[in-house]
């Protein structure tokens, strides 16, 4: 299999390349009756889009959704939903000089080794352009989760280079181009990114994503664990090199008396586990974070070889993000929502007759 599909009951298959005529996806398994209109995709697609600030790629795509199937008179029918976005701002000439060169840190060499052929324009299938359709599918999952269970999925940039938030306010996240949770630091980020862009270099980042209102019981033991599927989903995003659930790698320095989340009738006293125990949701907020590497598309020369094995210096002159993490928040939200919707449907299919089990420990009221 080509591994272009995701999910078990709620499945998403994406297609298309960065500089092809269009990108799209097919969503199967969506319950019927969900109201959805093309304009509902706009908000999240624009949050992910390039060209919205000087700190992201200058490529400007309209990202207008066409609903091809699976929706009738504004409601899902239960049949496959086809979504399409036409590419309109490709600049393939930017890649003519490096079409036969393997850019260090990119998928050029690995795609060449696997397939014996590759589309060099904008990275082809390995481009982050593909994530546009994940965000589109995530719009449907987010809406269904919110309407059916009251689940709210949202994220924020929790590290840019060596800079971390010195305060936190969810309201601040949507009021700046960085999805940064502390408004007072935004000028510092602007200055940092301006200097980075002028230097021609790039930098890594970290994104946190949180789902509040997830009921207990979602997830399956062993091979269908909620945290394992969430980790795989986040790791599938371009440039992601590490994922944590809850306290993640910080758990290595903790003692059991610190890490265990004590339980009272009024609720859990902490959430080091990230809302998941034994692969199954606890009713607390599901929390995860992902680390994205610095983009390797740089104006600074780097040593590599070409398709003939000759040693060359490669310089990428196309339009690229100096920090891919800046636009990654809505992508992380989408992937978490897709995992949660798939797990919710699977839980309902197997355990729908179980009902509410006592005692029910309250989750967090606000995340």
Curated annotation (Swiss-Prot):
One Gene Ontology cellular component: cytosol
Q: InterPro entries in the record, alphabetically?
A: Chorismate_synth (IPR000453), Chorismate_synth_AroC_sf (IPR035904), Chorismate_synthase_CS (IPR020541)
Pathway membership, UniProt: Metabolic intermediate biosynthesis; chorismate biosynthesis; chorismate from D-erythrose 4-phosphate and phosphoenolpyruvate: step 7/7
Note one Pfam family from the annotation. Answer: Chorismate_synt
Q: Which UniProt keywords apply?
A: Amino-acid biosynthesis, Aromatic amino acid biosynthesis, FAD, Flavoprotein, FMN, Lyase, NADP
| Enzyme class, first EC level, given as a word | lyase
Q: How does it assemble?
A: Homotetramer.
One GO MF term = chorismate synthase activity
* GO biological process per UniProt: amino acid biosynthetic process; aromatic amino acid family biosynthetic process; chorismate biosynthetic process
Its biological purpose is as follows: This reaction introduces a second double bond into the aromatic ring system.
Reaction catalysed by this enzyme: 5-O-(1-carboxyvinyl)-3-phosphoshikimate = chorismate + phosphate
The EC number(s) given in the record are 4.2.3.5
Can you name this protein? Chorismate synthase
Q: Which cofactor does it need?
A: FMNH2
| Keyword Isomerase in annotation | no
The reply on keyword Flavoprotein is yes
């Amino acid at each position: 299999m080509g591994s272009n599909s995701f999910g078990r009951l709620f499945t998403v298959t994406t297609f298309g390349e960065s500089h092809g005529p269009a990108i799209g996806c097919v969503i199967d398994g969506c319950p019927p009756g969900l109201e959805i209109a093309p304009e509902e995709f706009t908000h999240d697609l624009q949050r992910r889009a390039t060209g919205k600030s000087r700190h992201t790629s200058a490529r400007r795509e309209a990202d207008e959704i066409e609903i091809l199937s699976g929706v009738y008179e504004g409601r899902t029918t239960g049949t496959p939903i086809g979504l399409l976005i036409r590419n309109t701002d490709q600049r393939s000439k930017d890649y003519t000089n490096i079409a036969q060169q393997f850019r260090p840190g990119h998928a050029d060499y690995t795609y060449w080794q696997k397939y014996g052929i590759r589309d060099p324009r904008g990275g082809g299938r390995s481009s982050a352009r593909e994530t546009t359709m994940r965000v589109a599918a995530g719009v449907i999952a987010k809406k269904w989760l919110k309407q059916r269970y009251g689940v709210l999925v949202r994220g924020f940039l929790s590290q840019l280079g060596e800079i971390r938030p010195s305060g936190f306010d969810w309201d601040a996240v949507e009021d700046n181009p960085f999805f940064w949770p502390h408004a007072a630091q935004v000028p510092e980020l602007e200055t940092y990114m301006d200097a980075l862009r002028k230097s021609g270099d790039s930098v890594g980042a970290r994104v946190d994503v949180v789902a509040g209102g997830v009921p207990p019981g979602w997830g399956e033991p062993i091979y269908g664990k909620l945290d394992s599927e969430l980790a795989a989903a986040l790791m599938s995003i371009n440039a992601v090199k590490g994922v944590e659930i809850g306290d993640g790698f910080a758990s290595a320095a903790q003692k059991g008396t610190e890490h265990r989340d004590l339980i009272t009738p009024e609720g859990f006293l902490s959430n080091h586990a990230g809302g998941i125990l034994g692969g199954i949701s606890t009713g607390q907020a599901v929390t995860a974070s992902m680390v994205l590497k610095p983009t390797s598309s740089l104006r600074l020369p780097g040593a590599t070889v070409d398709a003939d094995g000759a040693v060359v210096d490669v310089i990428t002159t196309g339009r690229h993000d100096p920090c891919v993490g800046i636009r990654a928040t809505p992508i992380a939200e989408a992937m978490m929502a897709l995992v949660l919707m798939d797990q919710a449907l699977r839980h309902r299919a197997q355990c729908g007759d179980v009902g509410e089990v006592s005692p029910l420990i309250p989750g967090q009221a606000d995340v």
